[in-house]
């Protein structure tokens, strides 16, 4: 609601003061950012077909930018959700040798993924965030387990490398005890690809409006943002993304979040 209100108010001021002297300005009220599907729906609707520059904004917690400050660039990371089902073979708990324990396969896979290492200078993480396994009773070998992983990487190339190691790790771990794997869900959001010219324009604008001292350093965050599907779909776009300080406390997505 805050972001929509900001853009609506800015659009009203731009129109009333007739600030657009040449060209055309579009204001994109994009839905479903948190689901990761909003930008792609706008693309399918033709919203960026005739666009050369595209700018996004996101409010920032007070630790990153105080009220009245803004950053000309937010370097969002790539994020990926992987939901993997492990299939074994059911058996009675008294006869485990007749079954294949899907829970064991999933545990092996979690440990295998935790052993993935990329270059220490790369900013990345991969961790299991959900583990579901229930045969319905406590004296049976479970035939299925489902694990969800959250993958993060600051750059798209790093995410490519992480994904390339992830799947062989889980497949090998499961195969080591005779289990198989099934990808139930996979969804990836690209990392930021910001254009130098667009970022420079934002820095110039922030300095002009808020003062040069209130134009803070670029922000690097492990969070994801589906805005960057725009540049994936249309590489010629000059994209910029700025962060706005607004006394946001105690933090983004907190149930008690407030901002000015």
Q: Each predicted region: which residue ranges?
A:
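Active-site cofactor/substrate anionic-group-binding motifs, chiefly glycine-
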Residues: 1
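Metal-dependent amide/peptide-bond hydrolase catalytic core
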Residues: 103-260
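Histidine/acidic-residue-rich, glycine-tolerant segments that coordinate divalent metal ions
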Residues: 4-8, 14-15, 19-142, 224
